[in-house]
Each structure stands twice: as C-alpha cells, then as structure tokens.
C-alpha cells in the first residue's frame, strides 16, 4: 500500500534491478498485493506529467518481471505531499488504482494549516484520505489527539512495518493501535538498504505485542483497502493525558 519500488521515478529504486530485488523480498514476506506510491508534490510537477512518468516506469518494471517466479496484483497510486490546494487537482488519478483511497504525506518539520478542512474537502469529492507513516510526524507522536480528530473526521492511518522494530517507538505505536488510531501497515520500502521491506518482521512484532487477532485485522485491512472495501476500524478511544503521560 506504500512503497517506492518503481524504478527511477523518485528517491526509491534507482533501476529495475533494485526494483526486482525489493519485489523478491516482499514476495518472500508473503506480500501479493502492491500499490506503487511514488512521491507526488504539486509544487514540483503536474498530475499529468507525474502519471505519464509513473506509467513509463511501471511498463519498464513489468517488462523486467516477465519470466520471474513471482505473481503480484499491482495498482498505481502516489504518496501525495499535503497541500490545501489538493482539492483543485485531479486527485482521482493519484488514488490507488481504481480505489477511492489517497495516500497523504504530511511535513515532518511542522504541522501544516488547514488539515481538517482539506480532509473534509477530499471526502466531499469521494476521496478517502489515508495518512502515511504517522510515526514520522513529531507533532502527532507528541499530541495524539490531533490524529484522533482526523480519524474521527473520516481519515485512516498507516504505519511503517520497520517502525515496529524500534522498541521505544513500537511501544508508542501499540498505544495508538489500542486507541483505534492505526488501520494498516506497509513497508514504505525505498531500497534494500534504505528502509528495506520488513513486513513479516513487523507483523510478528504486532502479534507479540498485541496478539494475533489485532495483527490479523490490520493485515486484513490492507487487503480490504487494496480492493476498495471498507476497513475494519477498531473502536476509537480519545487519548487522555494523565500525570504527563498519554493513556
């Protein structure tokens, strides 16, 4: 649902050899559905230019895949950098294939303005926002009620599998899951060295910390999202601060 495997289009796989290695690792981890979500920033390119470049990279990769002992279902999407002006674009072309789900990336340095209004406007257009790698936003980790408000307003949230392999961060993210603030897990893989695919390890950590039922629900949600189905969202619990700690 979130990866940078297409060759030569962003800061992910630099060529088809790297793309094939990443796909091989995803396949070994049991992944069969992949949405290619290359970076899109409306301040740097147009939707038309981006989708043309994405299609060319996809065709290059599928040609290289011929004869490989791996079978996947693919969709083309984007990791869309947040802007209040997104609603003025053809955001449907940036959703994951034929689904209504749009992967949104926020700045890591500051909380942008007009998030609630933009999420609302997208939903008015039939778009379902999926917030990428929530663990990378300091303002969310420090103030989880922000994410609670966005989820309560109809958005969904994704975490990176690799984040669960960092003990302190895993502990925090488990709280977010228990609050009902995390819906899907993905790899956000860029290369075999920079953010490699670690889906199986991430799921194992989920099972260890929160049990097989919770882990299975989050994995299943990924498949539901890929097929444009409604997600199995856990009951929302508003985080509260007690003695300086979020509970």
Cite the ranges covered by each PLM segment.
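An N-terminally biased module of ancient metal coordination in phosphate/nucleic-acid-related enzymes
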Residues: 1-71
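Mid-to-C-terminal alpha-helical segments outside catalytic/metal-binding sites
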Residues: 203-247
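Non-catalytic positions within long, well-ordered alpha-helices that form the structural scaffold/packing
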Residues: 27, 123, 177-178
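Extended substrate/RNA-proximal surfaces in nucleic-acid metabolism proteins
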Residues: 45-158, 233-247
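Short acidic, glycine/proline-enriched helix-loop-strand junctions
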Residues: 45-54, 62, 68-73, 194-221
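Active-site beta-loop-alpha junctions enriched in small/polar residues
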Residues: 4-6, 39, 77-81, 107-109, ...
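Short acidic/histidine-rich active-site segments
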Residues: 181-197
């Amino acid at each position: 649902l979130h990866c940078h495997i297409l060759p030569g289009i962003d800061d992910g796989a630099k060529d088809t050899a790297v793309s094939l290695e990443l796909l091989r690792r995803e396949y070994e981890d049991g992944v069969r559905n992949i949405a290619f979500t290359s970076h899109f920033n409306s301040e740097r390119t147009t939707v038309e230019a981006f989708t043309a470049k994405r299609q060319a990279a996809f065709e290059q990769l599928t040609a290289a895949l011929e004869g490989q002992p791996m079978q996947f279902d693919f969709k083309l999407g984007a990791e869309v950098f947040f802007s209040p002006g997104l609603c003025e674009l053809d955001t449907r072309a940036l959703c994951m294939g034929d689904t209504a789900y749009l992967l949104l990336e926020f700045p890591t340095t500051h909380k942008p303005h007009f998030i609630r209004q933009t999420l609302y406007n997208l939903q008015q257009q039939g778009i379902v926002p999926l917030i990428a790698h929530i663990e990378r936003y300091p303002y969310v980790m420090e103030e989880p009620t922000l994410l609670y408000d966005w989820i309560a307003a109809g958005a969904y949230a994704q975490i990176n599998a690799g984040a669960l392999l960092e003990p302190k961060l895993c502990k925090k993210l488990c709280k977010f899951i228990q609050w009902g603030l995390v819906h899907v897990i993905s790899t956000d893989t860029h290369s075999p060295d920079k953010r490699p695919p670690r889906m199986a390890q991430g799921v194992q950590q989920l099972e260890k910390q929160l049990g097989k039922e919770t882990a299975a629900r989050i994995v299943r949600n990924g498949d539901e999202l890929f097929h444009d189905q409604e997600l199995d969202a856990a009951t929302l619990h508003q985080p509260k601060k007690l003695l300086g700690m979020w509970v």
